[in-house]
Amino acid sequence: MSINIFNPFKDLIFDEQFCFLTGELTTEKMSVYPDWLMDHFKFRDDRIEMMDKSKVYRYGDLQLPCSKRVKDAFETLDETFREAFKKGYETVAALDEHLLFLWTGRMVYGMLYYEMRYENERMMKLRERFDLSPMLRERFANFHLMLQSIVEPVVFVGRKPWSIAVFPLKYSADIFSYRDDTVNLLFQFGVNGFGLIACLQDNGVLGEKQKDILSSLQKSLRMVKK
């Protein structure tokens, strides 16, 4: 039996009545950033700019239309990551990379979704057609397909399509450092205890190149603990 996989980048479909991940009609919503993360680090009311700096949102206002099964799947994932976060670096580092990809990818794609909606609305006001280059359509469509693996039978064969590194990090306070790049699909995240860097669509190239550096970081942590 064939499965129809939703690709919003084929016809640039980003309407609020369709689930961002599966394309199902829905009235449900989920936050771009995990609620527990916004509450713990108190950035729900902070502001974030779109890439061209002309549009500003509150983090807490960023919502994605989603089907119930997608919302449930991400809530389960959030709980897994929240429990690992409480226990610290070693527990987070031991998580399956696929789970780390889904957790980081949800935020990066969420911001990409808002960039697409904003750009579409901006072009409509100018009475111009919103479009993307073939290269970006393919890159974003592949990323979206990978994210669908949280609810659909998407299988990764051979080399992992991402590079993800978790490493020890020490801050002087319980703070939150975060950056993303929606065009290049990059994610950087740091808290007191560990940092996480994800290149979400590089076919594992960066992870292979930085293997020795990450191994040294992890070895240093073990030596300090002895």
Outline where the language-model segments fall:
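An N-terminal structural lobe/cap that precedes and organizes the functional/catalytic core
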Residues: 1-80
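C-terminal, charged low-complexity interaction regions
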Residues: 127-226
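Short, surface-exposed linear patches
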Residues: 41-43, 50-51, 88-90, 126, ...
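Generic structural hydrophobic/aromatic packing signal, biased to beta-strands
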Residues: 19-22, 67, 104, 189, ...
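Internal, well-ordered alpha/beta segment that forms a basic, Gly-enriched binding/recognition surface
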Residues: 49-125
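General structural signal for secondary-structure boundaries
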Residues: 22, 34, 67-70, 91-97, ...
